[in-house]
Curated annotation (Swiss-Prot):
Extra facts: Present with 606 molecules/cell in log phase SD medium.
WD repeats: 207-248, 256-296, 305-342, 367-406, 439-486, 489-527, 843-883, 1129-1169, 1216-1255
Keyword ATP-binding attached: no
Any one cellular-component term (Gene Ontology): vacuolar membrane
SMART domains xref list: WD40 (SM00320)
Subcellular location: Vacuole membrane
GO BP field: positive regulation of macroautophagy; positive regulation of TORC1 signaling; protein transport; regulation of TORC1 signaling
Species of origin: Saccharomyces cerevisiae (strain ATCC 204508 / S288c)
Chain positions with Phosphoserine modification: S1036, S1080, S1087, S1089, S1123, S1133
Subcellular location, principal: membrane
Protein name (database record): Restriction of telomere capping protein 1
Length: 1341
């Protein structure tokens, strides 16, 4: 097909169509369904062939590549075939196509050849045949409207320098510019190049309209009037009939607005009225009959809406729709159309007014979240469609509540559908929520209802034009809001549209082109959609989208209209009826209101509107002084009756449109995963463990979910208990101190009355002390209980001896001072004891928690057959059990030590009790009750002696309970291979030492030796670990409290024999020689476990004589082993020195074993940690660091933090976010994630000026004032609820009207904000449902 360049003012005959630039012709498919709006440059190609160098017109106005934006929320994807089908060449005749010429002509026109893919055409796609009119002008266009004269097929288009009257011809389908009111005498050309006075036209200044150039035409008697924005604050009225160059077409100018005018509109019923709104937030109403001068600076009615700038204002239309029935033709209209108007504002508010009471708006709706841009009334129902910058088109019911049910569909269809409008709201909800919302995805600047009668609001059509790059006009059916009915494409983005009638619609675009479509000949979007399409839902590929096979329709089945025979249908007044005696030149809107609008034929508004008004917008008083008889009406005037058909509120059955079913791929995969997990749980343990072994990732996830990493959450309860315990102790100390002070005063005064008061105080103290003894279960032999009993006995003796007061005053004072001194010493000791008890109790609770965690982790590893890690945790658990056993035994020994005398008890408690804790009231072995509940899975480790199995049935498990109950039994250690040799060498050395001592005549005192060796022994024992040293010192009270050694001969272990070298113990009266004679190499063998070495150490430290013997022995051997200062070296002692060096090594080895046992928990855990790091066991490494780093300092703190941080990254990688959050929450360290773990900063901006709120100036000012006055409360005034830049406060609470100083606030659907406490009190406590600010609708359900 050969195409010629575009010709100006040419019509489009049948058979050809222009092809828009950058549009491809293809079929519907997967790519088109996903993003069909984007052009593919490879789908077609244009080649220009020209015989001359003159450029083509099409090339000069070539449209740039545009990438339209889409709203994925409405689910509409236009196929490219439908988009390009608007310019189909199958409708217009070819012989009248101005673009096509004969192929043989050699004119200076360029030809174009179009290459398309043969396989790209879908035979099922219906081509467009609706584009009838199109033309291009050389003037910039911004607005379009139709001429409301049925005899003239006219359009009015306006721009900055253009106001033209265009006529279209249905016969030849052409559009021509009849007259340009800016360029005179341009009735034959839209370019305006011809003029009767060319010289004058060159010197004449062209009139330019404002950038917001709106154009409207009048109705009825004023149908020849055209209103445009001549400048930003004036409205110019032109006469269409004055098209010659001699006549001046300007009728008048209306200029009262102080800022730019955004919109104006003619009244369809009262055609002499024109309304305007602008940036000054004022609505002006003008009466053209009273403004016949060339310029009018005063409107008839001015309404200040008390809101922000007005974007659009419209009168309620007054269409007359005729229909036929049994009685003939009837006309349907709306009797309120002469009085009602609405405006939409930058704030998004929609206001509805009544001209008869303009002081108060009828309705105020929060229509949009951003600025509202346009509105349009429904032709015959009280609905308004609004468009905003938020990309939404909303339908609002603005009628009276009593008639709301007439226009509300109760149930739209039998089942909910994604395409069905939401009409289940009640009448009150319709005031606050839109009846329908269409998400367009781009700002809506123009929208118009199809001028056709519709009894069901959802069968109405709505044309929408956008502000963005969408080169199309979409026509939606309200019955199907997700898929438009028609999409009318243009070359460039659309600027405006207008309905000529029910079928014909015109629009203008940025390419200065005027287009007209017949929508009856346009295919619907459903007809061009692919019937079998499945594609990705979005660009990320997170879902599939498919279309159902049932296409559906765009209409709702309407019920049949059955008007009653008694209803009289009268025609709505379509023309202005002037009274006989009325002079139209002298009649304005004020006179019309005073005379009851008798000349207009409108009914009285007195029965409808209440006389009382609320405080609202202000208005001019020019037209509001009404006489008492102002509501009288002319009896001959036509009475208007609502002829809108009344139907019953029956349920309507909707034809459900295609339902979009989205398949969420992540959700499907998640369901598959859950199904697999549920199926895997049914398998046996062997298959599960094998799968864990085969998949390291699954094993890691399982261990991360099942293992316990921290005991902090369980430790919080014990902390609170310890805190309460300490508070109780402090309170009792305060009471006791007060009581003692009072008691001392009463003793000094020696008055009988004071003595009685002292007795009462003593009774109160006794009650308090007895209560505390019962509360904390202190035994009778407890130190604190002993002191309390001693105090009671002293007071009893004091009361008994009070009758005989014949002693000396000096003796009394001395006795009082001694008692007070003893009490002070006891109080100090008691305070130290309680602090130590609290610390030890906390350590015991920590050990109990760690033991339970170790048991749990061992069971987790056992469930997956990981025996290596199972044994590791069992080893850790047993080591912790030994520590727990030692702590509980030290507590029991402290109870027995309390029976010492006063001085020894004080010294002992001050020195040694720093290592003891809170006494247990139970008998021996009862301290393991906490451990019993933690190892229920292995009860054989805690069986009593009676339940102990045989030797064949014994397993190598821990016997904590048995050992705690039988602490008096002293086990013995097994001899080793070096014991015989060591004892033999030791005996030889001692004999040589005695011989040399006899020869040299040395006389060394035993006391001196003991003192020297005690000093050396302390220096050697100092670097040893504290657990072993504490065990040696805390074992001696047990031997004193349990006299088992006196009943039978002491059975010696290897350490007893070797270290003490005396089978019968040491006697203080015997000398060293006697000890040497009692040396025996025999040993007693016992079948106890190697762990009994701890008890051997305890038995070694049970008696003081044994310790002294060992000290003397070491002092005797010191000169020979390695101390040359005690004895001079001799030539014959070289062999003995060599012998003593080997002996010294073996003795040091034995002492090291005693001081650092192999079951030391710190040493053991460090070795396990090193092994885990070397083998790469990440879970075990992190688990050890979490549990034991703060207790045993396994490694450096930086290394521990780095390891935990990497572990958190692993958890995030495998999507274990919940576990990572718990690990980070209970981690004992801070700043694990470094800079990544810092909290996000919140930046607040002023809602008035938009600046960042820092308030540094006010902060410095308040700080300086606080420093000068010394009042720190002044800084409480500082905050971020105000702005230093604009010196204004932020939004106040809607209820208490105080500033919102904190971040916690509540935002209601209407936009109001408030404190959380205020909103909670308003809605929950007072059971309110509306906004506290009085906004209509339900704000809280």
């Amino acid at each position: 097909m050969s195409l010629s360049p575009h010709v100006e003012n040419a019509s489009i005959p049948k058979g050809s169509t222009p092809i828009p630039k950058n549009r491809n012709v293809s079929s519907i498919g997967k790519g088109e369904f996903l993003g069909s709006s984007s052009s593919n440059n490879s789908s077609f190609r244009m080649n220009h062939y020209s015989n001359s160098g003159q450029p083509s017109v099409l090339d000069s106005i070539r449209r740039p590549n545009l990438t339209p934006t889409f709203s994925y929320s409405n689910g509409v994807y236009m196929p490219e075939s439908h988009r390009t089908s608007s310019f189909n060449d199958s409708y217009l005749p070819y012989d009248k196509n101005p673009y096509a010429k004969t192929t043989g002509s050699m004119s200076n026109k360029s030809n174009m050849k179009i290459k398309t893919k043969k396989n790209a055409i879908n035979t099922n796609t219906r081509k467009s045949s609706g584009l009838i009119y199109t033309t291009k002008v050389d003037k910039e266009l911004s607005s379009i409207d139709k001429v409301n004269d049925p005899n003239i097929n006219g359009l009015v288009c306006a721009g900055k320098t253009h106001l033209g009257l265009y006529k279209f011809s249905p016969s030849d389908r052409s559009i021509k510019c009849v007259h340009d009111f800016i360029t005179p005498n341009s009735n034959t050309s839209t370019r305006g190049t011809t003029s009767l006075l060319p010289k004058l036209s060159k010197r004449t200044r062209q009139n330019k309209f404002s950038t917001i150039a709106d154009v409207k035409t009048g109705f009825n008697n004023y149908k020849n009037c055209i209103a445009v924005c001549n400048n930003s604050t004036a409205i110019s009225i032109y006469d269409l009939n004055k098209s010659s160059s001699i006549d001046n077409p300007l009728i008048t100018s209306l200029c009262e607005h102080t800022r730019s005018i955004n919109s104006f509109d003619f009244n369809m019923v009262e055609s002499n009225l024109i309304i305007s709104g602008g940036q000054d937030s004022c609505v002006k109403i003008w009466d053209l009959r009273s403004n016949k001068s060339k310029s009018s600076n005063r409107s008839d009615i001015s309404i200040n809406t008390a809101s922000d700038s007005i974007r659009d204002v419209k009168w309620m239309p007054g269409y007359n729709f005729a229909s036929k029935n049994d009685q003939g033709s009837s006309t349907y209209g709306n009797l309120k159309s002469g009085y009602k108007f609405a405006s939409i504002h930058d704030s998004g508010y929609l206001l509805k007014f009544d001209l008869r009471q303009p002081a108060q708006y009828e309705k105020k709706l929060n229509a949009h979240t951003g600025p509202g841009l346009c509105l349009n009334w429904h032709p015959n129902q009280e609905y308004i469609a609004t468009g905003g910058r938020d990309g939404k088109c909303c339908l609002w019911f603005v009628g009276d509540n009593a008639n709301a049910a007439e226009n509300t569909v109760l149930n739209y269809g039998n089942s909910p559908s994604l395409h069905a409008p939401n009409t289940s709201l009640n009448n009150s909800g319709s005031l606050a929520f839109p009846k329908l919302t269409i998400n367009t995805g781009y700002p809506v600047t123009k929208l118009k209802f199809k001028p056709a009668y519709s009894s069901n609001i959802y069968n109405s059509l709505l044309g929408i034009s956008s502000m963005g790059d969408e080169a199309e006009v979409r026509i939606y059916s309200l019955a199907r809001k997700y898929i438009p009915k028609h999409v009318l494409l243009s070359e460039t983005p659309s600027l405006g549209l207008v309905w000529w009638d029910e079928n014909l619609i015109f629009n203008i675009d940025k390419g200065t082109r005027i287009n007209g479509w017949d929508i009856n000949k346009e295919p619907t979007v459903l007809e061009n959609l692919s019937k079998n399409t499945t594609t990705w839902r979005d660009l990320d590929g997170n879902g599939l989208l498919s279309v159902d096979q049932e296409i559906g329709s765009y209409e709702v089945v309407e019920p049949e209209l059955q008007p009653t025979s008694s209803t009289t249908c009268k025609k709505h007044p379509g023309t202005i009826k002037n009274p006989k005696n009325g002079n139209p030149e002298n009649q304005g809107i004020i006179g019309g209101i005073k005379k009851g609008f008798s000349h207009t034929g409108l009914t009285s508004f007195t029965p409808e509107r209440p006389p009382t008004l609320k405080a609202g917008p202000t208005f001019s008083t020019k037209s509001l002084t009404l006489a008492s008889g102002a509501s009288s009406f002319n009896s001959s005037s036509a009475s208007l009756t609502s002829l809108t058909p009344q139907t019953e509120n029956r349920e309507e059955i909707a034809i459900e449109p295609p339902c979009i079913i989205t398949l969420d791929i992540p959700q499907i995969f998640n369901n598959i995963r859950l199904t697999k997990i549920a199926h895997s749980r049914k398998k046996n343990v062997i298959s599960e463990s094998s799968s864990m072994k085969n998949s390291p990732v699954e094993k890691f996830k399982y261990l991360a979910r099942q293992l316990k990493f921290s005991y902090i959450r369980e430790h919080n309860v014990s902390d609170s208990a310890d805190t309460a315990y300490k508070n109780d102790i402090e309170n009792i100390d305060v009471v006791k101190n007060a009581t003692e002070t009072h008691g001392d005063n009463t003793t000094t005064t020696n008055n009988n009355d004071d003595g009685d008061d002292d007795d009462d105080d003593d009774d109160d103290d006794k009650i308090i002390e007895s209560h505390l003894l019962k509360k904390y279960n202190f035994p009778e032999n407890n130190t604190w209980a002993t002191l309390m009993n001693e105090k009671v006995n002293n007071k009893k003796s004091k009361r008994n001896s009070s009758s005989s007061r014949e002693f000396d005053e000096k003796d009394v004072r001395s006795s009082i001072s001694s008692i007070s001194a003893s009490r002070q010493s006891h109080d100090r000791a008691r305070k130290i004891d309680k602090n130590v008890e609290a610390e030890l109790q906390e350590k015991i609770q920590t050990l109990v928690d760690l033991i339970s965690i170790a048991t749990h982790n061992a069971s987790v590893y056992l469930s997956i057959d990981d025996l290596t890690n199972f044994k590791i945790w069992i080893l850790i658990r047993d080591s912790l059990l030994w520590d727990l056993k030692w702590m509980t035994s030290s507590q029991i020994s402290s109870d027995n030590a309390s029976n010492m005398d006063a001085n020894e008890s004080s010294d002992f408690e001050a020195g040694e009790n720093l290592k003891t804790g809170k006494e247990f009231p139970e008998e021996d072995g009862a301290g393991t009750s906490g451990a019993e509940s933690l190892v229920e899975e292995r009860p054989q480790a805690f069986r009593a002696n009676s339940d102990e199995p045989s030797d064949a049935e014994k397993k190598p498990v821990s016997k904590l309970k048995e050992q705690l109950k039988n602490t008096e039994i002293i086990p013995y250690a097994q001899p080793n291979e070096d014991s015989d040799e060591v004892l033999t060498k030791l005996k030889e050395l001692q004999n040589q030492r005695l011989e040399s001592r006899t020869k040299m005549g040395e006389t060394v005192s035993d006391d001196v030796i003991i003192e020297e060796d005690e000093h050396e022994h302390q220096e050697e024992e100092q670097p040893h670990d504290s657990p072993t040293k504490s065990a040696q010192f805390h074992a001696s009270p047990i031997a004193k409290s349990i006299p088992i050694l006196q009943k039978r001969e002491h059975r010696k272990s290897f350490i007893d024999t070797f270290m003490l070298h005396s089978p019968n113990g040491y006697n203080g009266d015997t000398d060293i020689g006697n000890e040497d004679d009692n040396i025996s190499p025999r040993f007693t063998y016992n079948s106890v476990s190697p762990r009994s070495k701890v008890s051997s150490l305890q038995s070694y430290a049970t008696t003081t004589s044994q310790l002294e013997t060992f000290k003397k022995l070491s002092s005797h051997t010191a000169p020979i082993i390695g101390s040359p200062r005690h004895a001079p070296s001799r030539p014959d002692s070289i062999g003995r020195e060599q012998l003593s060096s080997s002996l010294t090594k073996k003795l040091a080895k034995c002492k090291k074993i005693i001081a650092d046992p192999p079951w030391d928990t710190k040493k053991l855990i460090k070795q396990l940690y090193n092994q885990a790091t070397e083998t790469g066991n990440v879970v075990l490494t992190v688990n050890i660091l979490f549990l034991f780093q703060t207790i045993y300092q396994i490694t450096e703190i930086d290394i521990a933090k780095d390891a935990i941080a990497h572990f958190l990254l692993l958890l995030h990688r495998y999507e274990l976010f919940g576990i990572a959050a718990d690990v980070l929450k209970y981690c004992p360290f801070e700043d694990i994630m470094g800079s990544e773990g810092d909290q996000s900063s919140i930046r607040l901006f002023c809602e008035r000026c938009g600046e960042l709120i820092t308030n540094e100036s006010s902060k410095e000012k308040l700080r300086a004032e606080a420093q000068q006055t010394g009042n720190k409360k002044i800084m409480d005034k500082f905050g971020y609820w105000y702005c230093d830049s604009c010196k204004k406060k932020n939004t106040s609470c809607v209820l208490c009207e105080r500033p919102l100083k904190k971040l916690t606030m509540v935002i209601l659907p209407c936009g109001h904000e408030g404190h959380f406490q205020c909103i909670q009190e308003w809605f929950l406590d007072e059971n309110e449902q509306e906004c506290p600010g009085g906004c209509p609708g339900v704000a809280f359900i």
